[in-house]
Amino acid sequence: MKKYLVMEDGTVLSGQGYGSYKEAYGELVFTTSMTGYLETLTDPSYVGQMLVFASPTIANYALEMGKMESNGVKVSALITKDAHIELKKGGYGREFDEFLKEQGIPGIDGIDTRMLVRKIRANGVLRSYVVNDPSHSLDFPDPMNDDLVSKAVPHHDPVFVKGEEGGTVLFIDLGSKNTLKELMLQNFSLIVVDKQTNLDEIEGYDAIFVSNGPGDPSHPSLSNVIKFLSHNIGVKPLFGICFGLQAISLAYGAKTYKMKFGHRGSNHAVTDGTHSYVTTHNHGYAVDGSTVKDFKVIGWDANDGTVEIIEGDDMFAVQFHPEASPGPHDTRWFFGEMKRRIGYA
């Protein structure tokens, strides 16, 4: 089955289709992670995006369904050089091709991903389709104009998770992955809500945590969350990861911007001026450091200087993923820092 990758600049690439027969549309981005492909594909921050794996070989070890970061694959499509689509090992008994068919996600293999990564780095992310017939006329709307957070997290009633000794955290889920499990391991009690919840009606918590998520943090659909965070500056301790850092920064009055091709992968170096860490990233937006006034930037990306760690009075947030999944555990100290700042360390 032949499939085609059609980009907004007119480039058309052909390859071997696998997974679902469906066609797909999204923002074409790449990840530099060499392993952890299942965790990557199931990260809700990828909603609205088609993913290129910079690593040429994918799915060369068996699927472990317990390592999924959400309830399913979140990328719109995946583009690979050499996917082992029929690999079936051990007791898992799942082929990659079969799994993607069940998830309704198309893949296209045999693509020169090295060339494609260079193209994205040079030109920025590209709106693209994976199609079965490239002869049709196609429109290329901006996926970031959509309310991607609602696609990642449907509205639900608040969920209470009882911990043992770590205090109670209001967990604003904007597309969380493994962070929820990490906070449970820290013995926090959690009140889990989504962005459509009336946050002002929730009571009985000691701190507020804002999760990662997809899309543009300044999207109008998130205005109620930003307003709520703004009203709680200096009232409750605020914490955030990735998208959460951006949302908190907006609440303080800072600005965010869209990056040329973003940071995605489990091998990004971050420095605080004293220590350096290897971290996992998945974001296409960042905080404009020149607009920061009422909090401090205390960590930066070692390659391009992107804002990575911020702190203020009763506020602490990171742009990277200390829970990794996939990736290194250099920054798991973040969760201990949360407990210390809340007063339960």
Curated annotation (Swiss-Prot):
Disulfide bonds: none
CDD domains: GATase1_CPSase
Role according to the record: Small subunit of the glutamine-dependent carbamoyl phosphate synthetase (CPSase). CPSase catalyzes the formation of carbamoyl phosphate from the ammonia moiety of glutamine, carbonate, and phosphate donated by ATP, constituting the first step of 2 biosynthetic pathways, one leading to arginine and/or urea and the other to pyrimidine nucleotides. The small subunit (glutamine amidotransferase) binds and cleaves glutamine to supply the large subunit with the substrate ammonia.
Pathway note: Amino-acid biosynthesis; L-arginine biosynthesis; carbamoyl phosphate from bicarbonate: step 1/1; Pyrimidine metabolism; UMP biosynthesis via de novo pathway; (S)-dihydroorotate from bicarbonate: step 1/3
One annotated GO molecular function: glutaminase activity
Taxonomic source organism: Thermoplasma volcanium (strain ATCC 51530 / DSM 4299 / JCM 9571 / NBRC 15438 / GSS1)
EC number(s) stated in the UniProt entry for this protein: 6.3.5.5
Stretches for region CPSase: 1-169
Domain Glutamine amidotransferase type-1: start-end pairs: 168-345
Keyword field contains Amino-acid biosynthesis: yes
Name of protein: Carbamoyl phosphate synthase small chain
Family stated for the protein in its record: Belongs to the CarA family.
